[in-house]
Each structure stands twice: as structure tokens, then as C-alpha cells.
A protein has these predicted regions:
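Intrinsically disordered, low-complexity segments enriched in small/polar residues
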Residues: 2-63, 72-128
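Exposed beta-strand face motif in extracellular beta-rich ectodomains
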Residues: 67-69
Length: 128
């Protein structure tokens, strides 16, 4: 076989493998709480503090992640801590267009599960 062709194929394969291992995902949080409540979200990923976001009613915010994304969330006097992206758990189950879509409601956090094509309750607010 032509050496140049073999080398080109090798290079192409290496580049595509390297590309897929560095895949970025998007974690989106949509505020669907009652009473126009604001949702406060404070996330950390891979030892970095990503700051605090206030997501107003019927708005969303997205983080681009490739590692675990852990967030403190609160509204009114309700508080919780959730892993909203975990590459082992989520890379295939919620990666619709590489996006983990969360809808935050009064009873808890719903995730769009690609295989079931619907939102499913994953985490309840503590105490609920
Ligand atoms: C939500 O936040 C916005 C902007 O930070 C603020 O103007 C609004 O009053 C807040 N709404 C409630 C219900 O606390």
C-alpha cells in the first residue's frame, strides 16, 4: 500500500480520536419554577469556581463542560446540590446535540433523556 496514503489515514484517525476524547458538552438549565421565582445557580467544575448565575423565570443559562459539573441551586428558601453533568453518566443519555437539558420545576430537576425523548425527574429538592 502507498506509504503516503497509509500515513494520511493514520493521521486522520489520530486526529478524529483526539477530537472525540476532548468533546465538549453543553449543560443548560431552564427555570420553570412557580411564582416567577428566580433560580440562583453556583457551579464548579474540575476545581474551578464558575461563579453564580441568577436565572430568571422562563430563561436559561448554559455551561460548556467536559468534566463533572456540580451546582448549588436555590430559590426562595429551597436549596439543593446536584451534579448536572457527569461525563460517565450523561455523555450518551442526555447528549442530544451534545446538550444536557435540565428543566427546573417546583418538585425537582427534570432532564431530557435522549433515548426516551422526554423530560424525566432526576432529582427532587431536598425535603420534598
Ligand atoms: C428576579 O431577578 C430579577 C433580576 O435580578 C429581579 O429584577 C426580580 O425582581 C427578581 N424576581 C423575583 C420574583 O425575586
Amino acid at each position: 500500500m502507498n506509504t503516503l496514503l497509509t500515513f494520511s489515514l493514520f493521521l486522520l484517525l489520530t486526529l478524529s480520536l483526539a477530537g472525540s476524547s476532548m468533546a465538549d458538552y453543553k449543560a443548560t438549565v431552564f427555570n420553570n419554577l412557580p411564582g416567577n421565582a428566580n433560580l440562583t445557580v453556583h457551579c464548579q467544575s474540575a476545581g474551578s469556581d464558575l461563579g453564580t448565575q441568577t436565572i430568571t423565570y422562563l430563561h436559561d443559562f448554559s455551561w460548556t463542560v467536559s468534566n463533572l459539573l456540580n451546582c448549588d441551586m436555590s430559590w426562595g428558601n429551597v436549596k439543593g446540590n446536584f451534579d448536572i453533568f457527569d461525563p460517565k453518566r450523561d455523555a450518551s443519555r442526555c447528549a442530544y446535540g451534545n446538550t444536557c437539558f435540565w428543566r427546573v420545576k417546583e418538585d425537582g430537576l427534570y432532564l431530557f433523556i435522549q433515548e426516551h425523548k422526554r423530560l424525566e425527574l432526576q432529582f427532587k429538592w431536598p425535603g420534598n
